[in-house]
Amino acid sequence: MEKFTTLEGVAAPMRIINIDTDRIIPKQYLKTIKRTGLGQGLFSEMRYNDDGSENPDFVLNQPAYRNAKILVVGDNFGCGSSREHAPWALADFGIRCVISTSFADIFFNNCAKNGILAIVVPPEDLEKLFEDAERGANATLTIDLAAQTIKGPDGGTLHFDIDEGRKHNLLNGLDEIGLTLDQKAPAIEAYEAKLAQREWA
């Protein structure tokens, strides 16, 4: 998993509450178990018209936000079913950070497992970030995970809280398998060294 240390990128605003996982990645894209290629289906019911053409009104289709790395979204993002395809689709599109006042628990945990930083902020901070994100091409935020700060385009800085274990895993690029190996590595190395010293009949 890619390490998350500092992220600087355009933030796209989505002033919509209760965006569920069905809207993040519709069911027709769930047939695959691959993590790649799902970015095409991200928010597809909002991104595309019925004829398959792009909806020009959707934020990620607008020139200023096509390469957004950060989403600033409404309350209760990622609610609904527990599909891990939702963070897969976000990551494949290029989204590394999502900021809201609250997330569904399963989605929140799945983000961390897939290298996406989900940040919870109070309503007044979210409104400030929405205003920053609505600047279009100038909507650049800088996320410093080690310092737990969000720096806006005007230089203002907001602080956020994060669980220390989640922070450690993201900073070091550790998913569940990587974390297990990281924790067990000394014991594994000692066991292998002991085996190497044994005399086999």
Curated annotation (Swiss-Prot):
Gene3D superfamilies annotated for this entry?
Aconitase, domain 4
**GO terms of biological process kind:** L-leucine biosynthetic process
EC number, UniProt record: 4.2.1.33
Pathway in which the depicted protein is active? Amino-acid biosynthesis; L-leucine biosynthesis; L-leucine from 3-methyl-2-oxobutanoate: step 2/4
User: Catalytic activity annotated for this protein?
Assistant: (2R,3S)-3-isopropylmalate = (2S)-2-isopropylmalate
Recite the UniProt keywords alphabetically.
Amino-acid biosynthesis, Branched-chain amino acid biosynthesis, Leucine biosynthesis, Lyase
Example GO CC term: the record gives: 3-isopropylmalate dehydratase complex
Q: How does it assemble?
A: Heterodimer of LeuC and LeuD.
Role according to the record: Catalyzes the isomerization between 2-isopropylmalate and 3-isopropylmalate, via the formation of 2-isopropylmaleate.
> What HAMAP family does the annotation carry?
LeuD_type1
Protein name stated in the entry:
3-isopropylmalate dehydratase small subunit
**What organism, scientifically named, is this protein from?**
Methylorubrum populi (strain ATCC BAA-705 / NCIMB 13946 / BJ001) (Methylobacterium populi)
